[in-house]
Amino acid sequence: MMTYFVFILSTVFVIGFVGFSSKPSPVYGGVGLIISGGVGCGIVMNFSGSFLGLMVFLIYLGGMMVVFGYTAAMAMELYPEVWISNKVVLGAFVSGLFMEMLLVLYVLKEGSVGSMFEFSSLGDWVVYDVEDSGFFSKEVVGISSLYSYGVWLVVVTGWSLFIAVVVIMEVTRGG
């Protein structure tokens, strides 16, 4: 039952991303991003990451609401464009939904999806010993794998955020 619940949440997550990537109007794009962020936090909470899910929900979505409020106020249109008002935007949205449905049917037919990475050195990570048995904390393992195996992701993300701040400063300055 929980597998289907996560599968439905993942589908809503991707549909929300398709909704805001087709960006008909900033208002609808922001709503799609907020829905996808909330559903992503629910997925994280389902996999026993309650602290991480709660922090992302409070910090990310709290910040998103502030940014969304300012951008929606600055880019407000008298007649905002919806997904069905432009044939190109509607075609992009429908083709994205079609690709998602093909992926859903493939996963349901095959029954599994492979993983790209295999983590063989789990002994290097933090193990909590309780009497004769030990266990890994999922949040500690996730953070340690992010900074060991995914250091390239941290570098690219940091650089992207830096460039985004520089671009925003140049746009608002008028240069």
Swiss-Prot record:
It comes from the Eukaryota. It is an enzyme of class 7 (translocase). Its main location: mitochondrion. It is found in: Mitochondrion inner membrane. One of its GO terms (cellular component) is mitochondrial inner membrane. The keyword NAD applies. Coiled coil: none annotated. Pfam families: Oxidored_q3. It catalyses: a ubiquinone + NADH + 5 H(+)(in) = a ubiquinol + NAD(+) + 4 H(+)(out). The chain crosses the membrane at residues 1-21, 27-47, 49-69, 88-108, 149-169. One of its GO terms (molecular function) is NADH dehydrogenase (ubiquinone) activity. InterPro entries: ComplexI_Subunit6 (IPR050269), NADH_UbQ/plastoQ_OxRdtase_su6 (IPR001457). Keywords: Electron transport, Membrane, Mitochondrion, Mitochondrion inner membrane, NAD, Respiratory chain, Translocase, Transmembrane, Transmembrane helix, Transport. One of its GO terms (biological process) is mitochondrial electron transport, NADH to ubiquinone. Its EC number is 7.1.1.2. Signal peptide: none annotated. It is a multi-pass membrane protein. PANTHER family: NADH UBIQUINONE OXIDOREDUCTASE SUBUNIT ND6, NADH-UBIQUINONE OXIDOREDUCTASE CHAIN 6. Belongs to the complex I subunit 6 family. Core subunit of the mitochondrial membrane respiratory chain NADH dehydrogenase (Complex I) which catalyzes electron transfer from NADH through the respiratory chain, using ubiquinone as an electron acceptor. Essential for the catalytic activity and assembly of complex I. Core subunit of respiratory chain NADH dehydrogenase (Complex I) which is composed of 45 different subunits. This is NADH-ubiquinone oxidoreductase chain 6.
